[in-house]
């Protein structure tokens, strides 16, 4: 299988990414002004608990020109691949124009939509209306449904219309596993 990672950012960050990838993965690079998001966590040595963290480069945004370069590159690549994986962490790929663009891949689009301490509650998966697979963790699903009390299996059943245009809905629960709903 051919796997291509589309990386947008500075050249110096590209080498950081390459260190962690299998050599068989091809990298297509688009130079943008964006830098890798860097999280610096401060941990108590005794309890091994995080005390706080600093986050750098989380406000990166594509310029209009950079955004168009990304769209053009993906349009050139898309015919060569059976699957498109989108990891939406609420950074540069989650702006309205790119979300709308990714909707054109609905038959082969797998989305993992996650929030983090920087954008918790602001990067919700319900901005995606259709695709092959959508995945999120339980707290993020609860944010979408605006319900923090009900049992998760009942919550999935009563809110099945939210993601019924996806073939599969995955709600992860960390070490407890996940729920998989087939539509």
PLM regions and their residue ranges:
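Ribokinase/PfkB-type carbohydrate-kinase core domain
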Residues: 1-183
